[in-house]
């Protein structure tokens, strides 16, 4: 055991001693609240010592103790901050403990009306879950909650960023209707801003691919509708690719479909999300040529 861990354990013992003294009759008469403040300081210092030793579990425990004492003393904001500190330690070793701490922090901030803070913490939880494919549904849930709070605070840009994550993962989980709805909403929102207008092209492209995953005819109608909403979309490589893919699927030409994707990818690299969706469309066409 290193020096820092030894000091941290001493500080924890000191904190517990102060709390025991505070509970006694004389403690309550003579500066009981000061003893609690001293105990909080000991736990926070111990937490930092454990952090220096990279003992993340013990560090998290110390910040949780400090948070509980802050909450008991009525210092809700400080309690929220300590739960966040605890979460940052736990997330290096135990995602669920990290999430539990952030949820406690969120409860405090929503009760205080600090919805932007609550939204950011929901976003952090979503980010923790998104690294595990088995937790994508949980990630979606927290991104949606974050977006909801951001919208309530008029942070439209932050809300849209979260909703785009929801759409991305919804499509991965084959909930294409949900993904389409979000991409279309965010595209429409982007068209209202001269700065964001150009990004609508990507969202329409993603929505069209989701349509193509469900129904060829729907995809054909959708891209015509998108071209009316945003005429510049018609001149884009994305629009032309969707058009060619639709034609190849209509003709049951899988080789043509593959070539069109390769040509596009040679100039504009397709990331894993696009590749996954396109492979699913190709596989479905292989298995059931009559997509119409």
From Swiss-Prot:
Cystine pairs: none
Any single GO CC term annotated in Swiss-Prot or TrEMBL for this entry: terminal bouton
UniProt subcellular location: Cytoplasmic vesicle; Membrane
Membrane topology label: Peripheral membrane protein
Keywords noted in UniProt: Cytoplasmic vesicle, ER-Golgi transport, Membrane, Protein transport, Transport
Molecular-function GO terms, alphabetical: ATPase activator activity; SNARE binding; soluble NSF attachment protein activity; syntaxin binding
Pfam family, one: SNAP
InterPro entries found in the cross-reference section: NSF_attach, TPR-like_helical_dom_sf
Region forming the signal peptide: none
SUPFAM superfamilies for this protein: TPR-like
Keyword hit for Membrane: yes
Any single GO BP term: neuromuscular synaptic transmission
Keyword Protein transport: yes
Function: Required for vesicular transport between the endoplasmic reticulum and the Golgi apparatus. Also between the endosome and phagosome.
Family, per entry: Belongs to the SNAP family.
Protein name as catalogued: Alpha-soluble NSF attachment protein
Organism: Drosophila melanogaster (Fruit fly)
Name of the gene this protein is made from: alphaSnap
């Amino acid at each position: 055991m290193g020096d820092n861990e030894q000091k941290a354990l001493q500080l924890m013992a000191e904190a517990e001693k102060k709390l025991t003294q505070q509970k006694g009759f004389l403690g309550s008469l003579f500066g009981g609240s000061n003893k609690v403040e001293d105990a909080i300081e000991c736990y926070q210092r111990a937490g930092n010592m454990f952090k220096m030793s990279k003992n993340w579990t013990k560090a998290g425990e110390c910040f949780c103790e400090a948070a509980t004492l802050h909450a008991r003393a009525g210092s809700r904001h400080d309690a929220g901050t300590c739960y966040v500190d605890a979460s940052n330690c736990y997330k290096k070793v135990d995602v669920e403990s990290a999430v539990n701490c952030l949820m406690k922090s969120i409860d405090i901030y929503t009760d205080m009306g600090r919805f932007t803070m609550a939204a950011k913490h929901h976003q952090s939880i979503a980010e923790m879950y998104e690294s595990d494919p088995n937790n994508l549904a949980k990630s979606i849930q927290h991104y949606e909650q974050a977006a909801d709070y951001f919208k309530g605070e008029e942070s439209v840009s932050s809300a849209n960023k979260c909703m785009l994550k929801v759409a991305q993962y919804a499509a991965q989980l084959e909930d294409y209707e949900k993904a389409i709805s979000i991409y279309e909403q965010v595209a429409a929102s982007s068209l209202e801003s001269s700065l964001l207008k150009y990004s609508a092209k990507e969202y329409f492209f993603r929505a069209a691919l989701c349509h193509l995953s469900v129904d060829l005819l729907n995809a054909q109608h959708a891209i015509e509708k998108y071209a009316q909403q945003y005429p510049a979309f018609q001149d884009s490589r994305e629009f032309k690719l969707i058009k060619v893919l639709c034609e190849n699927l209509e003709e049951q030409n899988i080789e043509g479909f593959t070539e069109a994707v390769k040509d596009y990818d040679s100039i504009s690299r397709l990331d894993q999300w696009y590749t996954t969706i396109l492979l699913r469309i190709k596989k479905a066409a292989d298995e059931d040529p009559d997509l119409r």
